[in-house]
Amino acid sequence: MCIRDSRGVFVRNIPIDEAIEIFELRATMEELVGRRLAQNITATQQQEMENLVRNMERAVAATDSHAYHLLNLQFHDRLVEMAGNRKLASIYRKLVKEISLFRRLNLAGHNVLPVSAHAHWEILEAIKSGNPDTAGRVLFDHAMNSKARTIENDEQRRRAELPNDPT
């Protein structure tokens, strides 16, 4: 969101190349989060995250993509917060705000929500394994998959905007 004197508030349109860079930064940050949590997540925190994924599954069952999107944002934000690095959390939140539209569009595809919910169980299992390498890799891959969907969605949008050639 940007605020301009005498112009009001508006959402800044992020170009795809900038969004891709942000997804790459997000992946690296999430890898660090996974590594840290694999070493220090508490049973109470695990339970909280499991409850969030159950709520995500309920949103899938209700085909409520808006609720799912909000829960997905909350899931990742809570992981970042639980990692215990305030500066990381601050930078992460700033970056994910910039790509929120892309992330929402990534969840709009056919059968994406059930696959996404399952991926969040995999994230939790990797963290609970206690292996920092595994947890970091799973979170990194999860964010990079989101980047790949963003690129794919952008390519589809561009193809749809091309004029039909009658010849």
Question: Which sequence ranges carry the predicted segments?
Answer:
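C-terminal regulatory/effector modules of DNA-binding transcriptional regulators
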Residues: 112-167
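Conserved amphipathic alpha-helical segments that form helical-bundle/coiled-coil interaction surfaces
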Residues: 18, 22, 26, 43-104, ...
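Short, surface-exposed linear patches
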Residues: 25-26, 32-35, 102-104, 112, ...
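A generic structural signal for short
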Residues: 64, 111-112
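Short linear motifs at protein or domain termini
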Residues: 1-39, 44-45, 151-167
